[in-house]
């Protein structure tokens, strides 16, 4: 999730850094200013959500509506609350139908929470593809949330948004057991992303392993292990998967009968 966190951190900066400067552009009522300041000074994620809802409820026409809903979506995603993440993502799309952050969150989180034997699996995966393709279409021209964000930084964020969309499609393809298609999507995510996420290499390795492309799978797991930003969890999984790949290669090399 390195790539996703980078994009989220940039977007979260809209609220932390951007609101005071926006107040200077358009005077707000004292009550709204105080309510928004409460969002910025909240100490815990739950306090932030409460403060955001206070603004949205009591100042329904606030010009910061989309920014605050997006912030709430990101908070709930980081908390791991899938239902609330979807709630805010859908709410954000209602307000801004082309919002790439919301499209990517819906695609990625739905793919992550879909299981092989879900009765509505294909319905969920069709939505994943729809959201991810819309994100891919919108990311290259996604407007800056703040004019003072450097062009190079925003260009990197746009690339990471495209990578996140490809990764969501890769997860959907894996759930359909279309492993070659899945691997192609993960390779696209790696190629286009400005931030290299070792978790994507892990997913690529698994797709290649499932496709019985053992040499390529081993290479992907090696790259995940070698990534400077690989977490201990990623390294542990990559090591286990490397061992699994090596055992399968050894088994495939044995002649019939195991002699």
Regions found by a protein language model. Give the residues of each.
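Alpha-helical linker/edge segments of TPR/alpha-solenoid repeat scaffolds
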Residues: 78-84, 112-123, 156-175, 210-219, ...
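Short coil turns that delineate tetratricopeptide repeat
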Residues: 60-63, 97, 140, 194-195, ...
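Amphipathic alpha-helical repeat scaffolds of TPR domains
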Residues: 27-41, 63-74, 98-117, 137-147, ...
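Conserved structural position within tetratricopeptide repeats
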Residues: 57-60, 91-94, 137, 144, ...
């Amino acid at each position: 999730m390195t790539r996703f966190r980078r994009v989220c951190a940039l977007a979260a900066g809209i609220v932390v850094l951007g609101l005071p400067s926006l107040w200077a552009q358009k005077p707000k009522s004292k009550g709204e200013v105080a309510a928004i300041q409460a969002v910025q000074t909240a100490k815990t994620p739950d306090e932030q959500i409460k403060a955001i809802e206070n603004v949205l409820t009591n100042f329904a026409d606030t010009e910061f509506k989309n920014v605050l809903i997006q912030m709430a979506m990101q908070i709930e995603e980081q908390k791991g609350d899938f239902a609330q993440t979807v709630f805010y993502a859908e709410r954000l799309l209602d307000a801004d139908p082309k919002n790439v952050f919301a499209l990517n969150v819906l695609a990625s989180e739905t793919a992550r929470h879909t299981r092989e034997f879900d009765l509505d699996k294909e319905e969920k995966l069709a939505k994943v593809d729809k959201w991810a393709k819309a994100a891919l279409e919108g990311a290259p021209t996604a407007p800056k949330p703040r004019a003072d964000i450097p062009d190079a930084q925003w260009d990197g964020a746009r690339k990471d948004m495209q990578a996140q969309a490809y990764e969501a499609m890769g997860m959907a393809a894996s759930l359909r057991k279309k492993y070659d298609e899945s691997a192609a999507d993960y390779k696209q995510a790696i190629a286009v992303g400005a931030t290299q996420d070792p978790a994507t290499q892990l997913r690529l390795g698994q797709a290649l392993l499932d496709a019985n492309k053992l040499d390529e799978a081993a290479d992907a797991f090696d790259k995940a292990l070698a990534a400077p930003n690989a977490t201990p969890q990623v390294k542990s999984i990559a090591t286990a998967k490397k061992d699994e790949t090596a055992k399968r290669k050894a088994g495939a090399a044995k002649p019939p009968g195991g002699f």
